[in-house]
Amino acid sequence: VGSEMCIRDRLEAVAVSCGPGSYTGLRIGVSMAKGLCYGRGAKLIAVPTLELLAVPVLLGEHPAEEDALIVPMLDARRMEVYAQVFDRALREVRPIQADIVDAETYKEYLDRGAVYFFGNGAAKCMEVINHPNAHLVKNIEPLAKNMAPLAEKRFVEGKFEDVAYFVPFYLKDFVAKMPKKLI
């Protein structure tokens, strides 16, 4: 408990995955982070989920050529994914989009060279992306431990969010549905 108190007393910032992702998960995570920041007077750092997902590839934990493009993907149900295209330095090549994946979705990038797809939306996409430059990297999930380098960079750069007004990035509007089984 003593070491926990020391850490709490020195808390300068809280990092949170800001989306896209599960509506409920984002709301809970961001609410918890905002509460900690408000209560401790700490800064809020928002880390986009797709950047967080790319960290293992950037750190070389999974192989990818230096000139390759990387495409982190989150499953958005059916054949839709939330995806963003980066170079190996995590510079944005194409902004985040909700893609309905077919053989043509990433063709312009695949025709130029190697493209590495990963995340929980990637496996289903590989069924329709039939290209020799398409590579699936398995077993990459957005982990809190991978947030540290991205959060530290934002901390050093002074990229903080307004605790009172920050909201998660959902990408798509929430659509409420009636449950299939009524009680």
Model-derived segments and spans:
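Surface "functional belts" at beta-alpha junctions
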Residues: 43-142, 170, 175-176
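Residue-level signal for inorganic ion chemistry
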Residues: 14, 117, 148
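Acyltransferase
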Residues: 137-183
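Catalytic-loop motifs flanking and including active-site residues across diverse enzymes
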Residues: 28-32, 102, 143-147
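Short, small-residue-biased leader/transition segments that mark boundaries at the very start
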Residues: 1-7
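DPxDG-like acidic metal-binding loop motif
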Residues: 15-49
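Short acidic capping loops at alpha-helix termini that bridge into adjacent secondary structure
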Residues: 9-12
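Alpha-helical scaffold segments in soluble metabolic enzymes
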Residues: 35, 56, 124, 128, ...
